[in-house]
Each structure stands twice: as structure tokens, then as C-alpha cells.
Design a protein with these regions (language model features):
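Glycine-enriched alpha-helix->loop->beta-strand junction motifs that scaffold or abut catalytic
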Residues: 22-25, 45-50, 88-89
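Active-site/ligand-binding-proximal alpha/beta "capping" segment
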Residues: 7-28, 98-107
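Generic hydrophobic/aromatic pocket-lining and core-packing "Φ" positions
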Residues: 13-16, 39, 81
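Conserved, mostly hydrophobic/aromatic
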Residues: 19, 42, 84
Length: 110
């Protein structure tokens, strides 16, 4: 099941609960950063893992802002992951997977 473009929280929650009742073994919420409230609510309401996907547009925004010197790309990349997990995601999918794994291996992110 995937919650996306759900501008109505109640409708998104209803979809998630229905999908779990129908046998879904995971709930995917995307885009990650825009829907952290849904990640939090869904993770509290279902008994299956909640995954979130940081979509290509989020990746492109961070890359572009870093290229302009407006942000620290690594810091933002790490904060995005921490935010997803803090919201309740058990799985975080990102285009930054390799870079994020390196930061975790080096102890720069828990």
C-alpha cells in the first residue's frame, strides 16, 4: 500500500487501515518529508512496518540548494533520515542510501 498525494489525513489513514485489513505487509508513505505527519499517525495505528520514500524531487532540491552553497548537503541528508525515523518509519528509502550508510558507519549519524 502506498499513501501519496493524500491531502486529506483521514482519507490517507482510512486507506492504510483498509490495506492492512486486506493483508498488506507494509505501508509506504511518500513523499517522505511532506508527509511526516502521516508517517507518525500510520505507524501508531498499524501493526505492519511503515516505510517512507524520499522521492527524486526531494533529492533534487537538496542537491540544487547545496550546489548554490545555501545548505550543508550532508547535514540535510542526515536530518532527513533522522526525521523520518523519528516520525515512526521503520524503513527509509532514499537516493542518498550509500552516502547515508557511510555517515552511519563513521558514527556521524546514529
Amino acid at each position: 500500500m502506498c499513501i501519496r498525494d493524500s491531502h486529506n489525513r483521514r482519507e490517507g489513514m482510512k486507506e492504510a487501515l483498509t490495506d492492512v485489513e486486506e493483508g498488506a505487509d507494509i505501508i509506504m508513505v511518500k513523499p517522505a518529508m511532506s508527509y511526516l505527519d502521516m508517517v507518525s499517525e500510520v505507524s501508531k495505528a498499524v501493526n505492519v512496518p511503515v516505510a517512507t520514500y524520499s522521492v527524486s524531487g526531494e533529492y533534487a532540491m537538496v542537491k540544487a540548494a547545496a550546489k548554490m552553497g545555501w545548505i550543508d548537503e550532508e547535514r540535510i541528508m542526515c536530518e532527513m533520515a533522522v526525521s523520518a525515523y523519528r516520525a515512526g518509519a521503520q524503513i527509509y528509502l532514499t537516493y542518498y542510501a550509500k552516502e547515508l550508510a557511510k555517515c552511519m558507519d563513521e558514527g556521524r549519524i546514529g
